[in-house]
Amino acid sequence: MSKHKLEYIWLDGYKPSQSLRGKTMVVEDFSGKLEDVKQWSFDGSSTEQATGDDSDCLLQPVHVIPDPDRFGGNGWLVMCEVLNPDGTPHESNGRALIDDDDDDFWFGFEQEYTLIDTETNLPLGFPKNGYPDPQGPFYTSVGARVTKGRDLVDEHLHLCLEAGLNVEGINAEVMMG
């Protein structure tokens, strides 16, 4: 029997912008069901969610999906809320404010990102010297002259869909990268 790796993912307490955090629990057997994911703890003093003298915070799993990219089929992504040691929602846990019984509102988000060329430290496709062309031709563009990194974008989309994440679509933005 192979082991399963559950990657617990949560938002830290940094302001004004929270960042993703993660740690991996290894288990002998896992059904893939949320009710079989254990609550876990972490040191909140390193994530701006607790003080050093009282640093325990809890990770409450709220969603689990297969991780199609890692661990040969035995990987799972576990989305978590952060709780205080007494089980109440942590102040950084904005999701706790959502009323689960309220299905009258919908939201969506657009995940924008810029790919950086590690050799130049500039957005992918930017010239090494000078400035890029004006932004007009890049938005929703196709073709090698105006689009860079499409293979990575396509792979990202594929992995999200394989994991069961709802993605509405992709498009190039107003600049290279």
Task: Kindly give the residue locations of the regions a language model identified.
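Glycine-rich, acidic/polar active-site loops that bind/position phosphate-bearing ligands
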Residues: 1-177
